[in-house]
Amino acid sequence: AALWSGGVFLYVPKNVIIEDPIQALFLSDDAEALFAPHILIVAEENSSVTYVDNYVSGQDTGAVMHNGIAEVFVKRGASVRFASIHHLNEQATDITFRRAVTEQDARVEWMIGEMNLGDFASDTNTLLKGDGSTSDAKVICVGTNKQRMNVTTRATHFGKSSDSNMITRAVMRDEASAIINGITKIERGATHANGEQTERVLMLSPKARGDANPLLLIDEDEVTAGHAASVGQVNKDQVYYLMSRGLTQEQAERLIIYGFLAPVVSMIPIKKVEEQLKILVERKLGQ
């Protein structure tokens, strides 16, 4: 707490449904100033809210260090959608921890766009404590130049019949490298829990690197869980097929990349934010 430098406290009372998204903008324009915001969201029973934030720093700001924390507490029957886009400059280092705790029949949705130009690490974790609680996490990131990134998404099941789904998509170009981790943990007693995860890395350069690491830790017998992971170059057969339909190679590759990222981009709850994310993807890919 001693390192807090602002943030957001969002409290949603019991049975309150907030239709319009709550938006926040975090702008860093001083490399010497502490940049450690803390986001705290509490959604009481049967409430609902959508929260969206943007993290931005100017190109002339210098070597910004961001160390942020987001905590989300979702009470019984409540629902929280949390969308976040990070776009810090090339000299910035971004470290972000996100945590959610869901009670009985509660739901949390994570929608994360990691569009930083500098190195970053993020850890997004949901503790499904309540029976019938749900977590859905979708993360995309695009790496360029010699950027280094580490993206971890977790779901820990305590509640019976709890459900988690994690999808991470990463596109790497130039000499960028990514480590993508997905961790599903089902504790003893979480009978009939279900945990699914998918991590995929698409590389646009022979010098780009990507590791996809799915991990299932199961301490209960009566559960279902699955994972899928892939790392590879743009499919040449797909490019050839699209070019045979009249597209240029650049247009074909762009279409494949958008299709690769679409499961996350299409889930952004605000149209303008979705459009902003598409612009940032295009800018980072140099298209």
Spell out what each predicted region is.
Residues 1-240, 244-247, 261, 268-287:
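Conserved beta-strand/loop scaffold segments within soluble protein domains that form the structured core
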